[in-house]
Amino acid sequence: MTYLFRTLVLGTSALALASCGADEIVSPGTGGNITINNPPAPAPAPAPTPTPTSTLVTPAAGCPTISNPDQLVNDGTISGPTGEYRVCTMPARFTASSTLPFNRGILYRMNGRVDVGTDGGPAPDGSDGATDSNVNLTMEPGVRVYAAGSSFLMVNRGNRLTAVGTQARPIIFTSRDNVQGLNNDSSSGQWGGVVLAGRAPVTDCIAPGATPGSVNCERQVEGAAQPALFGGATPSDKSGDLAYVQIRYSGFVLSGDNELQALTTGGTGTGTTFDRVMSYNSSDDGVEFFGGRVNMTRLIVVGAEDDSIDTDTGVKANLQFVIAVQRPGVGDTIIEADSSNAFNNSTPRQNTQISNATFIANSGTRDQAIRIRGGTDYAIVNSVLVDRQGATPCLRIDNAETIQTTGDDELGVPRFNSFVLDCATDFRNGSGVTADQTQGIFNAGTNNNANFTNTLSMTFVNGANENGVAVFNPTALSSFFTNPTNIGAVYPGNNTWINGWTCNSATATFDSAVSACTSLPVYS
């Protein structure tokens, strides 16, 4: 009986041991009794960690109310890789000043041509019989606008666009395909673009017999099915303010061979301000300025399929801190400058002046990176031009009127100072101007170098060679300019302006860009 009892105890103990942890067992020794300690009550389970909040955007409940009589239309939602958004379609025309507020879950849509105000005519005082509607369309920082096909934004004379973003929240104009995540680094031409019209002087008038630069000299926006006129005699005219703005995938063909640029200005005046504007993958020009007065700082043009910067019809423009980078194998010129099409001595004569540019030619067209013609006056100072393909000549000048030294509203030959070229071929014969003549004009400037070896990094950031070039003081050209410490667009002490508000692509990468160009940024 004793033997049976011990057997039962041992068997029961083995089962208990199997259910206990090491710290719950007291060793029985070799001959003593076995003691089993009951485990302590388990600690309460911790509170569950909240499920992480998704970074994907969810749509706003509806569209905001605006001051315009015709309201935004709630057109449901649109989805893409960054989430789902409420689609708020703009009216075809803003007839009252209105604000498009930022909302993380809203995208504003243009369905066809969207007009800001009605055309107030070329005269600001009503002497032309037209009445200003004085509409100001304001977009808050972070607003994103998309469109498709022939849709474009038309800011008419006597009205304004106030699109002022911030470094962290730029204002973005883009395409439907971009929203839906369908684009790649070669996509382009998916909607029209942004057009600002003003009353500053232009040439090449559409009215026969009109005097260039006068209140009677007007021009029509290329490709617009309905009248979209610009021009007048008010150099200080104001068409709005643009800052921290991206314009992506523009250039849809409106009619025939007429395409819009990312940004088109027609007769805008000095009252219009531009700072930190980026054009990305326009199927036509990156920006084009038709007449007027344009003052712009910190312009970026990436991937334009025609000209990066096109200037025409008597514009007088000052640009400082400019980056233009072509996609490999794509694009025409970095700069195309004309004055008045076939009227080379019309006035006002174009005078465009650029300081602190970095131009990267990549098209391999074997044409030219910069073409100056049509009797225009032009100045490039404190700048760098590099041909990555080794096939495109740097500089071409056309027409005897472009290098003349006397004439109405004439500043003489093109001016180059502290301008360095890194091309396999520096100069090309033009129409009426030989490569040798162009070289002579270039060599007459100060601190120019046509045999430069670039040391750029990140595609456009100065290296030792660029920082070693003596600087030309551009305030001698215009009080608009500031006197820089170095040539080029990005250099020590001037290398943060590209941060935050830009977008990245295989063509050009910027520090702390707000997103890839193929994606929308997601804001908190």
Which role does the model predict for each range below?
Residues 1-9:
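Bacterial N-terminal signal peptides that target proteins for export
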Residues 157-170:
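Active-site-surrounding "flap" and adjacent substrate/cofactor-binding loops of secreted or lumenal enzymes
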Residues 4-5, 33, 42:
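Long, low-complexity, serine/threonine/proline-rich intrinsically disordered regulatory regions
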Residues 39-55:
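Ser/Thr-rich, Proline-interspersed low-complexity disordered segments
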Residues 22:
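Short, conserved catalytic or interaction motifs in soluble domains
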Residues 25-33, 50-134, 150-158, 174-284, ...:
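Extracellular beta-rich repeat passengers
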Residues 16-19:
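C-terminal motif of bacterial Sec signal peptides marking the signal peptidase cleavage site
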Residues 140-141:
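Left-handed beta-helix
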